[in-house]
């Protein structure tokens, strides 16, 4: 007499399993045995033992050191000359001696220090729609949106536009013979293509001139000239200024030396004496600011900044040192662990 | 009848008077049950209510609202609202999905079929269609769909056996009996003629109380709990019953008792909340500091800085506005996506659990089910397991295994059931020993309350005690087969010949007597014999004096010890020949005692005592309470994982201890600290004494376990004793609680939860475990055979007990490790990015200007770094599954990798260091601004976008570095996230001016940034240089002080030999401790048997302890007394079919 409380045995199940159709029906809840569901994807377990970390560190060192060297060489090849003119009375003339020739493209910058172009409310006070030609769109430009006197919209509106940098520079080369040659400069390549193509457009002219198009607007209070007289929104100096800087010590490209017009400068700026004439309009003394004029060449890595190259070299060397340290530790620990195990064996 | 107007009693019309169109005066609820959280209308309000109960959601809502104030938000108006909405909708999707699942499982229960009487015929309908007043028919082994009044059954006098283990956890069958006036209605014809009115109490939770009246033809009869069949119980050993439905659906006692599952939140969630609150205060502090900085800067620079002089009289320039601005700026320090990332991760972790083929049971075709997903990581923190016994550890299947007669020990442990041909061979010898064999087999076949039933030519034994049935079956398998019971006699087939044995008297089993006797007149010889079976202690002291019996006891004890070491339940059998005179003197006295009203129990016991003496020991039996598969292995593994295992059972102490031995909860040399006192003072003293003893045993490194019964527990949980009990409970690695009521189980769980902040897991299978499962941090239900009650109240349902090992060791340890990583990593990445705003504030006049573009800030958590934490949470395997299954000690070591304040601070510190490194390295690289050979400068976003790129790269590589196992999804997600940002930047750069004014700042920035070689070299350098220190520190720790996980992985990778493995381990004492556990569990699993020990050792250790459970699971106070039951049964009578 068989016990009636028998639990299902495996034979019953395998009996069902023999019948293919029924198996599917009966075992409908059986989970799929895919690697993903069963958490059985092929995996590599990174474990930072001496055997993995030592090669890693050495590889890092081996990659970093040459990159560091290249970067350092690149930065070293860049010539840069800076002259401060903050307190120079306008129109001021500064003599510059370039100790060596500045070969290739030569870029002329102005530097501003302690100038917070990245102040939140300042950055915000602009309207990119207006700069695309929609003159009446002055949203967000407060308090430089509508001129309180004329009730006309200010164009270009906003605090950034209002505070545009208005110093001008002329650079002249003085040969040993005493002949002074103006260094020809160009605005070609001073702004990013995107600014020219997508961000700054004058309003449609409608058969008139630019000033007709700007007719129903007022110039920003700080501006001395009407914007239409200096190229409207497509004014290069304006566009450069509107690309606000990230840090309170910033550099803006003013002009590039034109190497096509005068053969003297076809290879850049030759070594020698230069005279910089500055029309010093822009007030910075009140807030302790500083103004500089910069002449610089570039390398593939940009201007003169050896930081990244040195950093690569330092970290690369450190990695090599660490690798050595790891080897020492590894050997030392292996040794001490042997001893420890001997001790425990004695105790047993 | 009481008047209907006043009382709130339930009035039910039964039968013909119940017009289908005539409604009951009261409205009764339907039998459809629903455990859903939402319906179409309640979804939105309830969902929002649930969501905004969380602090962080309120926080982000506040931020989103604050951003609407003009000129205050540094990041625009919608940069919090949009990601927040995305995140809320992901949560909503998850909630809807889970509710649909609940609805499906409800529908399954609601759609169970049941037969309802309609127009004199049984019509098959669904459970949900059952309504109050219906007549229904339930067949054997079916569940009752509602609370029913038992009207009639297939058995004599309307008796029915039911199994209530789902309700109260008691394993023995209960006997219910229909009222005599209804028990005759055994056909649908009779039933459809039946009409009556029922008045009964309103629905209540009391399972053991019930009162009602049934009025038939104007005569009212009282009925009570003996006639009530509860929903959730199961009909057993009874072909069918007819019942009238009294309480349906949510009115039924089962559902009245089931609370709505409490919303459990894991310890990690609680800790995370604290961390978030901490960060909130950091945020407020930073906002205050920054606003102060802003004030100072303004004081020094405005109006001198003429380009900003328009801010001089700015109403939004005050300190408080500044605080608000910075509050919004830094709000992302609190990870907005953490909640949803965790939810998504847990959701998929739950899917892993549901899909684990190694937790799939072929027999029941069911898998593990994670019913809630927010406790996944809690499974990895379990310190206490509270396990139900019946149905969870044991199958509640009894098998007759061994037989001891004289010096011979029959049977073996290997076979499923008793199988020993030598028994019959010895019987055939025809000597004195063979008489003993015959007597034992006869006693097994006669001395019981089992009722045989012939069904389709097979004998089926019906019994309220599964042990007795096992013995009768055992005798039958040895050719002494009991097949007919009539009121005064039983007929057995003894070695091929029917033998009629007259039952003269039955002396019932009680828990005091611990024995049961029958007095029989042997059909063949006409001898009167007393057959007594019972616990060894009570039998041994009632034996004849003399050398012969002493010797028999000696043999028997030896055998019993052997049986006990395997956890078998044992019973001793003794007998005595009575003379006619002796019996006729005793019988009237006993009759008188039976009829006595006062002091009946004592009179009966006294009378029995007079007869039950000078007996001779004939043998002893061993019954195996079949364990579920792999129970001892599982328990050993769990204990090796440093989890304390408690067994909570309604059973008697002896039975409980027995099972504790067989399931490896304690071993033969484990000292049992038994608390069995009835008064508070005694319990207190005992506990105090045991605490001292436990400390002593701990010093001696000896195993010990506590055994406590329900009554003592009541005292132990009150007042001063509680402290001692808690102390003892924390010291014991194994605890057995016996004679527990379901509520007590829950109380114990709660008490242990309160003792220390440990995670308590409760596991059970029946409705009686529901309270405990709900009270525990994590509730696990066994869903195997029926899987309705416990499983549906549980957080995790598994088809087999032994899957608990995998659920905890693999899924628990993994998920905990993963979730902790997800949380810490989420904090890390947010702080790493957003604290950069603070560094930048120093360079931006404390104006609140962001260094990054506003939408890139908002999308950081939602897009660019959303995937690394998700893949960490889903694909990281800290240690291979096979390994942690093999070395459960690893589980304990993982608990130490917990979400501690130290660990949290480490990550936060790291985040700050990383952000400093990232910002200042970027600053130094970009300070000169000209990073192209075209000599141009990039402006504000050149710095911001570069820094952002480096942060994204660093954060994604950090995820890889933290990941313990690299699978392709991990690598793809981490590298892909960086790619995603690059793609985003390219696309975003192209937007302006095509879609409104969006993206003006970003216009062309991608081309500008990516045309710089310096940028690419910095991208290689800055993240690597930032992470190099992590790498170095991590490897130093791995080399010098490897964690057990690392050792295990190294071991697995065979980078070291096993010797080296141990040597490595011996380096740090902490690791050593873990290794001891690890290797001990290793050895434990290889040597396996701790049962091999000598008998003398065991008897020494267990001198005063009762170890052998005696096999009685008899229902003592049932509707029908044992004697009465026997006297009323005639197995030869034809049963009605009920059709």
From Swiss-Prot, chain A:
Chief site of localization: membrane
Keyword Zinc-finger among UniProt keywords: no
Cellular component, GO annotation: early endosome membrane; endoplasmic reticulum; Golgi apparatus; plasma membrane; recycling endosome membrane
Membrane spanning residue stretches: 53-73, 309-329
Subcellular locations according to the entry: Cell membrane; Early endosome membrane; Recycling endosome membrane; Endoplasmic reticulum
Disruption phenotype: RNAi-mediated knockdown results in the appearance of abnormal vacuoles in the intestines and defective recycling of endocytic cargo with the accumulation of cargo within abnormal early endosomes.
Record keywords: Cell membrane, Endoplasmic reticulum, Endosome, Membrane, Transmembrane, Transmembrane helix
Family: Belongs to the CDC50/LEM3 family.
Protein name: CDC50 family protein chat-1
Gene source species: Caenorhabditis elegans
The gene coding this protein: chat-1
From Swiss-Prot, chain B:
CDD domains: P-type_ATPase_APLT_Dnf-like
A biological process from GO: phospholipid translocation
Ranges annotated as spanning the membrane: 78-98, 276-296, 318-338, 831-851, 855-875, 901-921, 935-955, 972-992, 1013-1033
Catalytic residues, chain numbering: 388 (4-aspartylphosphate intermediate)
Keyword vocabulary terms for this entry: ATP-binding, Cell membrane, Endosome, Magnesium, Membrane, Metal-binding, Nucleotide-binding, Translocase, Transmembrane, Transmembrane helix
A Pfam cross-reference name: PhoLip_ATPase_C
Domain of life the protein comes from: Eukaryota
Catalytic activity from the UniProt record: ATP + H2O + phospholipidSide 1 = ADP + phosphate + phospholipidSide 2; a 1,2-diacyl-sn-glycero-3-phospho-L-serine(out) + ATP + H2O = a 1,2-diacyl-sn-glycero-3-phospho-L-serine(in) + ADP + phosphate + H(+)
UniProt note: phenotype after gene disruption: Results in abnormal formation of intestinal vacuoles.
InterPro entries: ATPase_P-typ_cyto_dom_N (IPR023299), ATPase_P-typ_P_site (IPR018303), ATPase_P-typ_TM_dom_sf (IPR023298), ATPase_P-typ_transduc_dom_A_sf (IPR008250), HAD-like_sf (IPR036412), HAD_sf (IPR023214), P-type_ATPase_IV (IPR006539), P-type_ATPase_N (IPR032631)
Entry keyword annotation includes Transmembrane helix: yes
EC identifiers of the protein: 7.6.2.1
Signal peptide, first to last residue: none
Bilayer disposition of the protein: Multi-pass membrane protein
GO molecular function annotation: ATP binding; ATP hydrolysis activity; ATPase-coupled intramembrane lipid transporter activity; magnesium ion binding; phosphatidylserine floppase activity
GO CC term (a single one): late endosome
Location within or outside the cell: Cell membrane; Early endosome membrane; Recycling endosome membrane
Family from the record: Belongs to the cation transport ATPase (P-type) (TC 3.A.3) family. Type IV subfamily.
Described function: Transports phosphatidylserine from the outer to the inner leaflet of the plasma membrane, thereby maintaining the enrichment of this phospholipid in the inner leaflet. Ectopic exposure of phosphatidylserine on the cell surface may result in removal of living cells by neighboring phagocytes. Regulation of the phosphatidylserine distribution in plasma membranes is likely to help in the maintenance and control of the membrane surface charge.
UniProt-recorded name of the protein: Phospholipid-transporting ATPase tat-1
Organism (species): Caenorhabditis elegans
Record lineage: Eukaryota, Metazoa, Ecdysozoa, Nematoda, Chromadorea
């Amino acid at each position: 007499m068989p016990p009636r409380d028998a639990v299902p045995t495996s034979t019953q199940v395998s009996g069902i399993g023999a019948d293919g159709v029924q198996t599917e029906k009966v075992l409908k809840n059986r989970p799929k045995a895919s690697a993903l569901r069963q958490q059985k994807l092929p995996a590599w377990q990174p474990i930072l033992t001496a055997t993995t970390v030592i090669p890693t560190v050495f590889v890092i060192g081996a990659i970093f050191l040459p990159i560091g060297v290249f970067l350092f060489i690149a930065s070293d090849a860049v010539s840069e000359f800076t002259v401060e003119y903050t307190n120079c009375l306008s129109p001021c003339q500064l003599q510059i001696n370039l100790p060596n020739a500045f070969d290739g493209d030569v870029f002329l910058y102005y530097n501003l220090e302690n100038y917070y172009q990245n102040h939140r409310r300042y950055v915000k006070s602009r309207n990119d729609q207006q700069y695309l030609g929609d003159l009446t769109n002055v949203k967000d430009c407060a308090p430089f949106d509508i001129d309180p006197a004329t009730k006309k919209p200010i164009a270009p509106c906003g605090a950034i536009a209002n505070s545009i940098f208005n110093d001008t520079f002329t650079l002249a080369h003085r040969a040993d013979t005493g002949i002074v040659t103006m260094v020809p400069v160009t605005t070609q390549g001073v702004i990013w293509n995107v600014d020219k193509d997508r961000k700054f457009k004058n309003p449609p002219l409608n058969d008139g001139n630019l000033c007709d198009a700007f007719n129903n607007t007022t110039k920003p209070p700080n501006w001395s000239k009407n914007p239409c007289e200096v190229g409207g929104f497509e004014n290069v100096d304006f566009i450069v200024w509107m690309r606000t800087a990230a840090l309170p010590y910033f550099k803006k490209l003013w002009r590039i030396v034109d190497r096509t017009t005068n053969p003297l400068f076809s290879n850049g700026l030759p070594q020698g004496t230069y005279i910089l004439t500055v029309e010093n309009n822009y007030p910075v003394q009140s807030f302790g600011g500083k103004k500089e004029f910069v002449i610089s060449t570039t390398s593939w890595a940009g201007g003169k900044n050896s930081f990244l190259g040195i950093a690569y070299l330092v970290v690369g060397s450190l990695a090599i040192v660490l690798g050595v340290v790891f080897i020492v530790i590894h050997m030392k620990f292996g040794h001490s662990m042997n001893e420890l195990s001997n001790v425990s064996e004695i105790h047993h | 009848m009481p008047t209907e107007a006043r009382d709130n009693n339930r009035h039910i019309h039964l039968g013909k008077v119940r017009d289908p169109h005539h409604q009951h005066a009261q409205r009764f609820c339907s039998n459809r049950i629903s455990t859903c959280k939402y319906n179409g209308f309640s979804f939105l309000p309830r969902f929002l209510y649930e969501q905004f109960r969380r602090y962080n959601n309120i926080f982000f809502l506040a931020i989103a609202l604050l951003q609407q104030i003009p000129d205050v938000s540094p990041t625009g108006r919608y940069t919090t609202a949009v990601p927040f909405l995305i995140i809320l909708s992901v949560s909503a999707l998850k909630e809807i999905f889970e509710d649909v699942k609940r609805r499906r499982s409800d529908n399954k229960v609601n759609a169970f079929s049941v037969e309802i009487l309609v127009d004199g015929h049984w019509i098959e309908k669904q459970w949900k269609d059952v309504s109050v007043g219906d007549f229904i028919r339930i067949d054997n082994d079916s569940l009752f769909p509602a609370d029913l009044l038992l009207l009639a059954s297939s058995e004599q006098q309307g008796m029915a056996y039911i199994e209530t283990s789902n309700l109260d956890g008691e394993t023995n069958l209960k006997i219910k009996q229909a009222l005599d006036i209804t028990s005759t209605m055994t056909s649908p014809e009779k039933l459809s003629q039946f009409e009556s009115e029922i008045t009964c109490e309103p629905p209540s939770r009391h399972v053991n109380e019930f009162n009602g009246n049934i009025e038939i033809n104007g005569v009212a009869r009282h009925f009570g709990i003996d006639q009530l069949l509860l929903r959730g119980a199961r009909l057993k050993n009874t072909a069918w019953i007819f019942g009238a439905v009294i309480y349906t659906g949510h009115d039924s006692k089962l559902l009245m008792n089931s609370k709505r599952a409490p919303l459990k939140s894991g310890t990690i969630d609680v800790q995370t909340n604290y961390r978030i609150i901490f960060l909130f205060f950091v945020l407020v502090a930073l906002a205050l500091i920054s606003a102060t900085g802003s004030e100072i800067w303004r004081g020094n620079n405005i109006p001198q800085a003429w380009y900003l002089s328009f801010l001089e009289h700015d109403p939004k320039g005050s300190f408080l506005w500044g605080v608000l601005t910075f509050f919004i700026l830094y709000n992302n320090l609190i990870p907005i996506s953490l909640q949803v990332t965790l939810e998504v991760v847990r959701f998929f972790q739950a899917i892993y659990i549901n899909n684990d083929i190694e937790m799939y049971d072929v027999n029941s075709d069911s898998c593990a089910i994670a019913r809630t997903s927010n406790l996944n990581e809690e499974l990895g923190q379990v310190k206490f397991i509270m396990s139900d016994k019946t149905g969870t550890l044991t199958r509640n299947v009894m098998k007759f295994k061994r037989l001891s007669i004289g010096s011979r020990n029959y049977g073996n442990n290997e076979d499923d059931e008793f199988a020993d041909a030598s028994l019959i061979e010895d019987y055939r010898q025809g000597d004195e020993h063979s008489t003993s064999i015959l007597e034992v087999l006869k006693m097994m076949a006669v001395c019981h309350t089992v009722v045989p039933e012939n069904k389709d030519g097979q004998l089926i034994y019906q019994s309220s005690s599964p042990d007795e049935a096992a013995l009768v079956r055992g005798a039958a398998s040895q050719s002494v087969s009991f097949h007919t019971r009539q009121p005064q006699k039983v007929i057995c087939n003894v070695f091929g010949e029917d033998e009629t044995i007259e039952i003269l008297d039955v002396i019932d089993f009680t828990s005091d007597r611990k024995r049961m006797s029958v007095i029989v007149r042997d059909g063949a010889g006409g001898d009167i014999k007393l057959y007594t079976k019972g616990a060894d202690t009570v039998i041994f002291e009632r034996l004849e004096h003399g050398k012969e019996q002493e010797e028999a006891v000696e043999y028997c004890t030896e055998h019993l010890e052997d049986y006990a070491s395997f956890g078998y339940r044992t019973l001793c059998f003794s007998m005595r020949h009575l003379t006619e005179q002796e019996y006729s003197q005793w019988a009237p006295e006993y009759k008188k005692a039976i009829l006595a009203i006062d002091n009946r129990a004592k009179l009966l016991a006294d009378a029995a005592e007079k007869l039950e003496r000078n007996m001779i020991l004939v043998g002893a039996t061993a019954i195996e309470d079949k364990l579920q598969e792999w129970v001892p292995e599982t328990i050993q593994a769990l204990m090796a994982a440093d989890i304390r295992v408690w067994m909570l059972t309604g059973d008697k102490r002896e039975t409980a201890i027995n099972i504790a031995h067989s399931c490896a909860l304690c071993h033969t040399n484990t000292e049992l600290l038994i608390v069995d006192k009835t008064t508070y003072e005694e319990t207190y003293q005992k506990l105090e004494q045991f605490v001292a003893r436990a400390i002593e045993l701990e010093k001696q490194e000896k195993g010990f376990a506590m055994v406590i019964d329900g009554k003592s527990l009541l005292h132990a949980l009150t007042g001063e004793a509680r402290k001692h009990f808690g102390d003892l409970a924390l010291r014991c690695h194994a605890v057995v609680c016996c004679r527990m009521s379901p509520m007590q189980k829950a109380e114990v769980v709660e008490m242990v939860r309160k003792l220390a902040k440990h995670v308590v897991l409760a596991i059970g299978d029946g409705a009686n475990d529901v309270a405990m499962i709900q009270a525990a941090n994590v509730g696990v239900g066994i869903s195997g055979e029926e899987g309705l009650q416990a499983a549906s109240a549980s957080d995790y349902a598994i088809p087999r007990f032994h899957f608990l090992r995998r659920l905890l060791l693999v899924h628990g340890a993994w998920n905990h490790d993963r979730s902790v990583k997800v949380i810490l990593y989420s904090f890390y990445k947010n702080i790493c990015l957003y604290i950069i705003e603070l560094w930048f504030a120093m360079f931006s006049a404390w104006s609140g200007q962001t260094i990054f573009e506003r939408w890139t800030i908002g999308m950081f958590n939602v897009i660019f770094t959303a995937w690394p934490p998700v893949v960490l949470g889903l694909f990281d395997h800290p240690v291979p599954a096979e390994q942690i299954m093999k070395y459960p000690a690893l589980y304990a070591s993982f608990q130490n990798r917990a979400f501690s304040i130290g660990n949290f601070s480490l990550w936060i510190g790291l985040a700050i260091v990383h952000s400093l490194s990232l910002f200042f390295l970027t600053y130094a690289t970009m300070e000169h601004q000209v990073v192209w050979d075209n000599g141009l400068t990039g402006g504000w976003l050149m710095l911001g976008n570069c820094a952002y790129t480096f942060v994204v790269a660093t954060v994604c590589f950090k995820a890889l570095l933290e990941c313990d196992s690299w699978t392709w999804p991990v690598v793809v997600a981490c590298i892909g996230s960086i790619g995603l940002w690059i793609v985003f930047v390219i696309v975003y750069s192209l937007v302006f001016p095509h879609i409104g004014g969006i993206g003006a700042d970003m216009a062309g920035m991608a081309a500008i940034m990516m045309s710089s070689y310096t940028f690419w070299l910095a991208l290689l350098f800055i993240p690597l240089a930032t992470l190099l220190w992590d790498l170095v520190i991590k490897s130093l720790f791995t080399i010098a002080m490897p964690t057990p996980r690392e050792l295990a992985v190294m071991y697995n990778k065979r980078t070291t030999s096993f010797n080296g493995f141990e040597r490595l381990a011996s380096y740090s004492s902490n690791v050593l401790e873990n290794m001891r556990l690890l290797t001990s569990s290793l050895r434990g699993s290889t040597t396996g048997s701790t049962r091999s020990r000598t008998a003398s050792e065991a008897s020494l250790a267990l001198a005063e302890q009762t170890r052998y459970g005696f096999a009685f699971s008899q229902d003592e106070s049932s509707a029908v007394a044992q004697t009465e039951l026997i006297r009323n049964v005639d197995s030869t009578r034809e049963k009605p079919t009920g059709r």
